[in-house]
Every structure is written in structure tokens, then in C-alpha cells.
Amino acid sequence: MKKILVLLVILCLSVSVQAQVDLFNGQNLDGWEINGTEKWYVEKGELICESGPDAAYGYLSTKKHYDNFELELEFKQEADGNSGVFFRSTVAGTIVNGWQVEVAPPKLHTGGIYESYGRGWLIKPDPAKDQYLKMGSWNTMKIIANGNTVTTYLNGHEMVEIVDEKIGKGKGGIALQIHSGGGIKVKWRNIKLKELKYHIKSFLLIDIIKGMFLTLTY
């Protein structure tokens, strides 16, 4: 009976992960919207954001919304390199409401989570983890948002994990940010996302199976 129950749990979890899709096709900005006057363009298969004449905040947001997902991407910071990856966020002009995983120069909390126009910094990485950032080289970031829980990784190292009810209720898309101030240039590539479906149903089914197991053992 125990072996059967374990198999059922594994099957339940396996159907929750959908096929990985490319959010950036390496050729153009199809599927994305430019917000603000900063520069967003494609060059040699890379997505580039660069400060424009207004030196203001700018965002490139997905047209589609994503709730539960695993997002992987690569970024390379040139010049100042102050940027970020927003999730479950909505953008109107240069006003974004939602949550940002920080992408910043050394000692400025890359991998931490910030709530825009709300509570501000929710969690910052341990300063010792700053060593994992490779300024001026390609870095790999992974963000897993599943219900109330968000976990971030930088170059294979877990940076932070937070459980937050407000984040769990958030709705919106993915957005890349370029910070205000001018002199910023960041490159992006290999932006891939897997949607995580049936999050609640999966765990409810596991609870039911556990209940069945407890009933059968007494």
C-alpha cells in the first residue's frame, strides 16, 4: 500500500509542470510591450536594454500573465547594470505594481525581492552571497513562484526564499526593468518559462492520499 501511495503522489506532482517556452525568440520583441522611453532592442540574438535620453525608468513587459511558474534567464550587466525582473506585476506607463527580483551591481542585493509602490524590500540575500554575482559576465537567474512561495537562484545558488500571502494573491506578467539615472546597459538572453499548473489541486490530492493512508493504517 505504501508503494502505491508514493506512486500516486509522484504522478500527481509530475503533471503540474508544463512544457518550457521561450519568452524571447532571439529575433524581435514579439509577445512583449515597451513601457517608457528607454531603449529596448535585439542585437545578435540578445535582448538589450539601454538608458535613453530621458534617463527614466523603463519596462519591457510580457503581454501574457503568469501565476505559478519557473523562470530561467541569463543577464549580463554593462555600464551601471541596475535592473530587475518583475513578476505577477502590472505596468502602466512607467508605474509598475508588483514584485521585483533585483538585478544590480555588486553589494546591492541581486536576487533579493522588492515590492514596488508598497512595502519596499521584503527580503535581501545574505551579504556573503554577493560573491555569486559575476559583474560584466553572463549570469544565470532562476525564479520559482508557486503560490505564496518565491525562491530565487543566481548561478545555481539559492539567494532567498519568502512565503508571503500578498505575493500569493498577486496577478500579472513578467517585466524586465531598466533603472532611472542614465548610463545603464544590460543584456538578456535565453529567457525561458515553465508554467506550474494545478498547484492547489495537487496538494489537496496529496492531503487526501495521506488521509487514506492514515485511515488504512489504523
Which residues fall in each region the model found?
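Short, intrinsically disordered C-terminal tails of secreted or membrane-associated proteins
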Residues: L214-T217
